[in-house]
């Protein structure tokens, strides 16, 4: 079996970690960095870029640079807010209402799972290079408040990337593993996880190798991206008031504003004020226009006050669900880069009466926890038991459009529960089972996970047939549902996979497509290496010709020069098949040329050779 890694697939950045020498450690990527931007781009030449290299070219290629895609994974277009779709790239929907991301460079539409898969593939490839062994399996983290569709979609992204996802675990739970692995005494910890696009709060009992989640709450549409957007809107309005130009119509300007907003937000975590300087942001008939704006931490906090206040609700909800007072919390662990914002740290301290524990790196702790879970599954770490919970209630639609809950939120998983139902009308011979997830009383306010039908019910009076509906949630938090008519024993079951928006054939096609691009990239890299090798060889050959032109036969010199010309021509025209052959020919010609050089006796030229021994 290959190495199992832990992956934090983040909205803004992703991290991969593994167990080395019995300890979890973050794996450095190909660029030498510990975090990889969750960004995928396709250039005008249809070249795939992932990570830092994709981020660097975002300003000049905004329409084909895809970031914050995690916000769309496993969701329908109707479920996404209009604000979330205000991006430099186009977010559209297919005929089934599924989200698609338009790539004008390839004239193609991608699912969010495909884009996420490209990030996963890079992480896996970098881990393989770093560890020196194949990586084929992974534990991937998701926000605790991800629903069944989003979890299944994350599994699909893993499949498309060509990796077997052994386990999906919640990000705050992973963070608690990293924090509490060596804790012997029992502690109640609150994990406050504010990342780039999602927000989770989990309360856990940790100690003696047991990690039990007591409650979880969150908001999958709140994160650092939203703070950036507030700053972008502020900059756009200030510029329009001053210059009368609306920058929202210029996607390159918007991309520059977004990058500047993120940079300013990060700087304000350590300084009281910063200056946003964007020369040549646009131009009109009077000439070029620039932005130079001072932003204080106080102004930033005022602008983002609503977002900061939204962080309060899940904390209070988690405490209520866990039946705990703030005084019962022993430690508060901060996770996610956005927890570096001083106003967030102050909010957490006021809500819990505890100074947040900052002994863990908020950017890396989730991946470290995922690596620990990977180590547990691979047998590298023993005596650790993880008891997670389902974040949202699950149930079925019953008469009158009501949701009847079968598994309540914050139930420890894996779990299996059954409820008895009957028919609503006389002589009813089939029932439609509509599976739902959420906390609202009525069907309309909850997430529909899927439908299936149980046929063959014996005709009888209303309320007589007994239909047992069983919900089964596995360790990944994924659901399967079974309905059984007790008199006849007829049953029908379904694994809720349609919720992921992709069927098996689509996932297979996307995997093939991803592998094709991986092969193309490998070929492209080999061709670049061949060009570099050819140029180096030509340089060496020219040097040899220059050094020994008087002592090498003319026909051999002409042969080498002709080969150099042909190689440079093939390099210009990208004729790689011919180039490969010519490089080998030049190597042989150079060897032949060197062997044709007359031997020079070095002793004859030694100025000391005529001296007699003393």
UniProtKB/Swiss-Prot annotation:
Domain of life (superkingdom): Eukaryota
Family annotation (SUPFAM superfamilies): Actin-like ATPase domain, Heat shock protein 70kD (HSP70), peptide-binding domain
Main localization, broad class: plastid
Molecular function terms, GO-annotated: ATP binding; ATP-dependent protein folding chaperone; unfolded protein binding
Stored Pfam families: HSP70
InterPro entries: ATPase_NBD, Chaperone_DnaK, Heat_shock_70_CS, HSP70_peptide-bd_sf, Hsp_70_fam
Keywords, sorted A to Z: ATP-binding, Chaperone, Chloroplast, Nucleotide-binding, Plastid, Stress response
Localization: Plastid, Chloroplast
HAMAP family hit by this protein: DnaK (MF_00332)
Function statement: Acts as a chaperone.
Protein family according to the UniProt entry: Belongs to the heat shock protein 70 family.
Protein name: Chaperone protein dnaK
Record organism: Trieres chinensis
């Amino acid at each position: 079996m290959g190495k199992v890694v832990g992956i934090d697939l983040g909205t803004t950045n992703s991290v991969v970690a593994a167990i080395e020498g019995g300890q979890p450690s973050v794996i450095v990527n190909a660029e030498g960095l510990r975090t990889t931007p969750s960004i995928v781009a396709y250039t005008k030449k249809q070249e795939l870029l992932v990570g830092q290299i994709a981020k660097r070219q975002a300003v000049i290629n905004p329409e084909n640079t895809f970031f914050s895609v995690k916000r769309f994974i496993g969701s329908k277009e109707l479920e996404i807010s209009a604000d979330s779709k205000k991006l430099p790239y186009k977010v559209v929907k297919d005929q089934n209402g599924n989200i698609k991301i338009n790539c004008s460079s390839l004239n193609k539409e991608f699912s969010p799972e495909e884009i996420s898969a490209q990030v996963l593939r890079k992480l896996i490839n970098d881990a393989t290079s770093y560890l020196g062994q194949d990586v084929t399996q992974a534990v991937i983290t998701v926000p605790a408040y991800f629903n069944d569709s989003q979890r299944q979609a994350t599994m699909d992204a893993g499949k498309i990337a060509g990796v077997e996802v052994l386990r999906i675990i919640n990000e705050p739970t992973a963070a608690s593993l990293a924090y509490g692995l060596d804790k012997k005494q029992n502690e109640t910890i609150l994990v406050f996880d504010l990342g780039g696009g999602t927000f989770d709060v989990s309360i856990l009992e940790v100690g003696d190798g047991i990690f039990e989640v007591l409650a979880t709450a969150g908001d999958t549409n709140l994160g650092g991206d939203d703070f950036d957007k507030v700053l972008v809107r502020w900059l756009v309005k200030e510029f329009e008031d001053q210059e009368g130009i609306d920058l929202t119509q210029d996607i390159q300007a918007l991309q520059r504003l977004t990058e500047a907003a993120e940079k300013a937000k990060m700087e304000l975590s350590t300084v009281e004020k910063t200056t946003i300087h964007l020369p040549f942001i646009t131009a009109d008939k009077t000439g070029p226009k620039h932005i130079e704006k001072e932003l204080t931490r106080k102004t930033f906090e005022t602008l983002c006050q609503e977002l900061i206040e939204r962080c309060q609700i899940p904390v209070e909800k988690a405490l209520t669900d866990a039946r705990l007072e703030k005084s019962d919390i022993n430690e508060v662990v901060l996770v996610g880069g956005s927890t570096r914002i001083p106003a967030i740290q102050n909010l957490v301290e006021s809500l819990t009466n505890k100074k947040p524990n900052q002994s863990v790196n908020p950017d890396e702790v989730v991946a470290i926890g995922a690596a620990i879970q990977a180590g547990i599954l691979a047998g590298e770490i023993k005596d650790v038991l993880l008891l997670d919970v389902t974040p949202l209630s699950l149930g079925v639609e019953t008469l009158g459009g009501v949701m009847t809950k079968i598994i309540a939120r914050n139930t420890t998983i894996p779990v299996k529960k059954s409820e008895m139902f009957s028919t609503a009308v006389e002589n009813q011979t089939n029932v439609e089972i509509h599976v739902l997830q959420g906390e609202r009383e009525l069907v309309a306010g909850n997430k529909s996970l899927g439908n299936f039908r149980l046929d063959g019910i014996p005709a009888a009076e209303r309320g007589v047939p007994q239909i047992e509906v069983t919900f089964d949630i596995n360790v990944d938090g994924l659901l399967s549902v079974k309905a059984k008519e007790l008199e006849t024993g007829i049953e029908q079951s379904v694994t809720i996979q349609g919720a992921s928006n992709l069927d098996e054939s689509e996932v297979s096609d996307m995997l093939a497509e991803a592998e094709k691009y991986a092969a193309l990239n490998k070929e492209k890299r080999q061709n670049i290496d061949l060009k570099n090798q050819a140029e180096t060889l030509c340089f060496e050959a020219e040097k040899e010709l220059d050094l020994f032109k008087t002592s090498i036969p003319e026909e051999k010199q002409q042969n080498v020069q002709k080969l150099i010309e042909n190689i440079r021509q093939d390099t210009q025209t990208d004729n790689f098949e011919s180039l490969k052959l010519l490089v080998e020919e030049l190597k042989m010609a150079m060897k032949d040329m060197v062997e044709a050089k007359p031997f020079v006796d070095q002793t004859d030229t030694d100025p000391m050779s005529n001296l007699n021994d003393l």
